[in-house]
Amino acid sequence: IGGATFDGGTVSTLHWGITDASGKSAIVEFDNGNIRIYDPGDIRAMTNDPQWPDMKAILAYWEKIGGSHMLPGTVSSPDRCVRANFFSHHVEAVADPSLAVSITRSILFNSCVPYTYLIQGEPNVSSTQWRSYADLKNRRYYFDIVTNMGYYYIDLTKCDLRKGASVMKLDTSKETMLAGEANNALKKSAPFTPLF
């Protein structure tokens, strides 16, 4: 997705997924300077490539084939999206937030690219370095970084999110043994400076 510049010079080459606490979602795509917003409907997975209308067509194709006997197995974005979407529709819906995160993690593990994976001549395929999950009801944001020994979360109900509050940061390059709630690892920091 080769979007033209936005936000003072940034170029977005990925899809942005937005979900509110009610579960309503939108997919934002930047396409040659145009912002396109899509309602994903019953699609529960998203990757950065290909463009959303093409991805919907690929998912519709695999929906007809079914996935009980065969799913695409490469590391390409479309194949990973098909696997994640299929499994998200074929797992138990649970009320327990911890179990829901565990189920989500297992689906994403199945659709990730192994860490340090590299194929020459395939610049659009890179290894998965992190996964994140949001519990919108309980306002917890989970992080699963491959170089960290566990996965952890920030409890947003315990963060000061008011205008003018201190910026807090968790330096994931220095924290490799986090598990569970990680609010105590947040440190005051200068605001994030974009690379552009």
Regions from the PLM with identified roles:
Residues 9-12, 21-23, 44-196:
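C-terminus-biased signal that marks the final domain/tail of proteins
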